[in-house]
Amino acid sequence: MTAGRRMEMLCAGRVPALLLCLGFHLLQAVLSTTVIPSCIPGESSDNCTALVQTEDNPRVAQVSITKCSSDMNGYCLHGQCIYLVDMSQNYCRCEVGYTGVRCEHFFLTVHQPLSKEYVALTVILIILFLITVVGSTYYFCRWYRNRKSKEPKKEYERVTSGDPELPQV
């Protein structure tokens, strides 16, 4: 096995994993995701651990969380205030559809129905594709038949061995 082939086999498994990690990192950076603790089933949601990435510290760290003090009740606009014990900071657990440091940004997802022009264009392109496939198949079949009919047929002749002792077939 050559060195290039070995390197290709090693990279084949690692490149998709690296791209996946890069995709998650970019998704977090672009959407400015907030802290979403993942409590273990049976663990109290008032005191569990979460993976947190802050603007000041881009590393992901595991921290303990508790509820915020009563004076921080209005801190989160659309979510629940949580206190990160290990970092001594307040963060928000946003409601579904909200994001941001204080859950102030709303994700407005609008699903627009397909326009008639888009549907018509799609149908036309599919029909053109099918016509191309059928036409190519027809052309190939005719070419193959013409080529086969133009070849002279090979007729087999009886060949004798020339040896009188051998039986002739």
Swiss-Prot record:
Disulfide bonds join 68-81, 76-92, 94-103. GO terms for cellular component: clathrin-coated endocytic vesicle membrane; extracellular region; extracellular space; plasma membrane. Residues 60-119 are extracellular. Keywords: Angiogenesis, Cell membrane, Developmental protein, Differentiation, Disulfide bond, EGF-like domain, Glycoprotein, Growth factor, Membrane, Mitogen, Secreted, Signal, Transmembrane, Transmembrane helix. Ligand of the EGF receptor/EGFR and ERBB4. Stimulates EGFR and ERBB4 tyrosine phosphorylation. Contributes to inflammation, wound healing, tissue repair, and oocyte maturation by regulating angiogenesis and vascular remodeling and by stimulating cell proliferation. PANTHER family: PROEPIREGULIN, TRANSFORMING GROWTH FACTOR ALPHA. This is Proepiregulin. The lineage of its organism: Eukaryota, Metazoa, Chordata, Craniata, Vertebrata. The gene is EREG.
